[in-house]
């Protein structure tokens, strides 16, 4: 919720991963389009978050880190479940960084892990890594 994000920001987290609904709750107004997100993202950064991954479902995700914005394309996959997709995205990103990948490549891995989880096809994660495009915004 918005209040949860405010409380967490006081601790200066290295990474947070809201989705659009959670970002809307933090902002206090609906954010239906990615073009409406930057002001709220900036408020999260000013509030203490270092890196932010904004998940947007089939529209992909954005990584805000040190003034750089990366966009990972969404993949059209069959939806088996959305439960755990955010956790898969976070764990993919953290695992990638721990493996020594660049932020861009760790973000690609994160998006692939989330897509594989949604599809219920975790064994296809490496294939999804090759299919996901990441570009700087």
Annotate each PLM feature.
Residues 1-35:
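Conserved beta-alpha-beta core of the PfkB/ribokinase-like small-molecule kinase fold
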